[in-house]
């Protein structure tokens, strides 16, 4: 069987790898000039660094198993996380449960309440019982008070903006499950994974395995149309860098594009198209600062302060060696935004000027002379907004067009989007496609 895959991110490459190992022909098309999507890298100080911050959790079994299979499992290293929370102009250490008891932004009873509440959520086994509630409503009703208003409410608003009160409670539940599962030791300190050589270690190896198995990966080649005949996918028309349109026939097609991209590539029935269009995506803007010294002592900073105009402050080299990056400290400043938001529209220089005055809130001694270099990245489909009762509305992997499949971050549920889940989904798609062929495509008959 000859299979066309749109997108060379984690899901597309993993599906291609498995399908090739099952004896199929595979061609992958990628609009960007690089592989790995949101896990792709740029050179910083002579070493690859992800365009957006990346790490793994100890329960990210899909990608860890893939690394073992690729022969690079020994490259994964585990580091203790170091977490701060910035609220009302002050930064507090919140790495361990003991730190939470010392969290001076809350009265003692609310600190205890906050910790016990997280344990309560962790013990919920069936996320389906939460589907009818938004995270905002559920947390207000069951946590409430200062513990909600000073911690979770600002974090929800920071991440989802005006959409904070639309997010289904299963999203919050899955976050709690992941964070607890990655804690080790008596002090329950979170351990985070990062591969030696960056995430390139995983995806360059995966890419090389695909090529060695006879697969093809066409970079800088956008698919402009999914061709169909009598309700069945028959091939792809792509556009090369030179503007040439190229048609390639396929027995089936897997698209890993965002829903709003996919819906423009092929005519779809109204009900399925509505499922795609009903999910709103937030974009993201990321600044990476190469600095002569660290801004804080933390790897991860939760920002629960409406006066700070960015959502995340991640100091990569507070967990990983700065020697990898020419001795500089690496700081990510990240934000999720509607694509119509004026901040999303800002240039690199405008965004830097907008953010800089706020860095002294985290370190009064900060001076812009610390900044040696700046990198900018924008993503149009960084975070889907998943609302209540989403299992009733999630788009099927098998589209109404015969032999045409869709797999993207709107279909990772109840978990939030993430590299591990994209790998898992890619493997599931390869299994599904192979099984459907074996069963003579009966799903569509």
Spell out what each predicted region is.
Residues 2-28:
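N-terminal Rossmann-like FAD-binding beta1-loop-alpha1 element of flavoenzymes
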Residues 20-44:
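Glycine-rich FAD pyrophosphate-binding loop
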Residues 45-127, 154:
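Dinucleotide-binding Rossmann-like beta1-alpha1 core, especially the glycine-rich loop
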Residues 77, 216-218, 372-375, 405:
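General small-molecule cofactor/ligand-binding pocket signal
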Residues 116-229, 240, 249:
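Active-site/ligand-binding neighborhood in enzyme catalytic cores
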Residues 387-445:
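C-terminal lid/capping helical subdomain adjacent to the catalytic/cofactor pocket in oxidative enzymes
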